Amino acid sequence: MINIAIDAMGGDFGEKPIIEGVLKALEAKPFNAILVGNSKILKPLIPKKLEQYIQYEEASEIFSMNGNATDALKNKETTIYKAINLLKEKKVDAVVSAGHSGASMSLATLRLGRLKGISRPAIATLMPNIVNRTLLLDVGANTDCKAENLFQFAIMGEVYAREIMQIQKPRLALLSNGEEECKGNELTKESHQLMKKIPNFIGNAEGRDIFNGEIDVLVCDGFDGNVILKACEGVATAIFQLLKNEVKQSFISKIGALLMKSSFKKLKKHTDWQEYGGAPLLGVNGCVIISHGKSDSRAIKNAIFQAINFSQSHINELIENELGKYNA
């Protein structure tokens, strides 16, 4: 059975939504959950029928959301340090954390190391499009990149899309300010030339192309990716609020909204980041899923499912093999 270490106390809302997410995941499929935190606080939250799937790793401190990621290595008593250490010692197959994302990334990179051929890891996230989903990377691990980094991101994203998203030939694109090969800054132009070696590379794409369903993997640096991610979260929230405001304007609008209630629910589910769980940190020697600090139990449950799928798919080995084809 898969062993998953969960940073049980690292999110914005404490241990309750995290434990609820673990329990929901266990009710759906069996796995061993290693809860990292204060067992005196955590044990009362576990029902007896699921106790057989739960173990505890004691950790006395939580890495502050206001802390500096560079300090993550200094305190070995934090929940995220101990969770990553379990993975390093191969006592677990994956780590899920809704704590400080910078600390998670720093610890994973420095404690686990990078995959062969990878110079920098990347955070990948799923974005809704009109057909299904688009994988966007990097969304925050690296604000400044070289062309070789973006090329490596492309390979990692392609493998992830093929193995986890089950897309046989994922369409891969590079974010730019125009579709033409000559568009973009020097980084984009140089990266484009490297990515032309990849058979599934379809060229440059603009920001709007994330949502048209014609791209499966979109590559960019962590600065642009994070701006896109946060902007999309804001736009989605604003659109639903505008719809609510308009519905309240008249009785006819309220009737129309009632008739479309089912469609609105489906739309909300498709665009809700909680449905996507977390973001895998690709390129490190292990499986680390970084969840949003504001994750509810549903997001934690889905992040755990991501971790299980990642662990069972042997993605890291496949990434190294794929990169080896180009480095030979």
From Swiss-Prot:
Transmembrane segments: none annotated. It catalyses: a fatty acyl-[ACP] + phosphate = an acyl phosphate + holo-[ACP]. It comes from the Bacteria. SUPFAM superfamilies: Isocitrate/Isopropylmalate dehydrogenase-like. Its EC number is 2.3.1.274. One of its GO terms (molecular function) is phosphate:acyl-[acyl carrier protein] acyltransferase activity. It holds the Pfam family FA_synthesis. One of its GO terms (biological process) is phospholipid biosynthetic process. GO terms for cellular component: cytoplasm. Coiled coil: none annotated. It is an enzyme of class 2 (transferase). It is found in: Cytoplasm. Pathway: Lipid metabolism; phospholipid metabolism. Keywords: Cytoplasm, Lipid biosynthesis, Lipid metabolism, Phospholipid biosynthesis, Phospholipid metabolism, Transferase. Homodimer. Probably interacts with PlsY. Catalyzes the reversible formation of acyl-phosphate (acyl-PO(4)) from acyl-[acyl-carrier-protein] (acyl-ACP). This enzyme utilizes acyl-ACP as fatty acyl donor, but not acyl-CoA. Belongs to the PlsX family. This is Phosphate acyltransferase. It comes from Campylobacter jejuni (strain RM1221). The gene is plsX.
